[in-house]
């Protein structure tokens, strides 16, 4: 299975209304399409946001209503982090904020090596503060990392930074879906703000 995740893109006027993929010379992909099986597939079930983690999990045949936990568990699996009962795992991005606005979602295309220095530093500094005793940050790849909160409540409303470049970040902080999740949302938001102070 070859997934062109995010390849469809939007038509570009200067390319005659074609997308970049339509405009590109793609002899190898053309051959794969000609010799293979192609078709249309609805990869995002009703009620789920159209993220790659949703679509890819559905394509692999999983019932999302039964198994979907968000990106965190996938991030943990990808780096070999073994989650324990009661752990709440979240994808944690390093991003660039300037003048209170999200400049970019990838911390300026940070390398994994550079990110590892920052994530280790943040983990060491946050561990000194009792309020973050149940928080663990683990390095992933480039700007994508893992946040694990022991006893965290996953019923949260989070905004993906890549969806909101140029917007003020404060109104986009984590919000609870239910009041019981307020302590977890508050903890994550304090961690975000403390991380900015430290970095």
Predicted regions and their residues:
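Conserved structured core elements
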Residues: 1, 22-26, 189
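Beta-sheet entry/capping signal
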Residues: 1, 38, 144-146
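Beta-strand elements within well-structured catalytic alpha/beta cores of enzymes
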Residues: 1-10, 32, 191, 199
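Functionally constrained cores in energy, signaling, and assembly domains
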Residues: 4, 24, 195
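Active-site nucleophile/metal-coordination loop of metallo-enzymes that catalyze phosphate/sulfate
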Residues: 8-127
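A contiguous, mid-domain pocket- or channel-lining segment that forms the substrate-recognition surface
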Residues: 71-194, 198
């Amino acid at each position: 299975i070859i997934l062109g995740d995010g390849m469809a893109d939007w038509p570009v006027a200067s390319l005659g209304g074609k997308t970049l993929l339509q405009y590109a010379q793609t002899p190898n992909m053309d051959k794969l399409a000609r010799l293979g099986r192609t078709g249309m597939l609805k990869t995002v079930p009703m009620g789920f946001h159209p993220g790659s983690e949703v679509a890819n999990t559905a394509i692999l045949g999983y019932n999302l209503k039964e198994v979907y936990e968000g990106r965190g568990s996938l991030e943990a699996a990808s780096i070999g982090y073994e989650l324990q009962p009661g752990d709440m795992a979240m994808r944690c991005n390093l991003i660039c904020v300037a003048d209170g606005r999200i400049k970019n979602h990838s911390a300026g295309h940070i390398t994994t090596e550079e990110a590892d220095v920052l994530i280790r530093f943040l983990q060491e500094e946050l561990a000194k503060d009792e309020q973050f005793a149940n928080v663990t940050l683990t390095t992933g790849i480039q700007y994508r990392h893992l946040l694990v909160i022991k006893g965290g409540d996953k019923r949260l409303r989070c905004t993906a930074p890549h969806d909101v470049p140029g917007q003020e970040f404060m109104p986009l902080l984590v919000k609870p879906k239910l009041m019981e999740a307020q302590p977890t949302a508050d903890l994550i938001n304090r961690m975000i703000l403390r991380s900015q102070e430290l970095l």
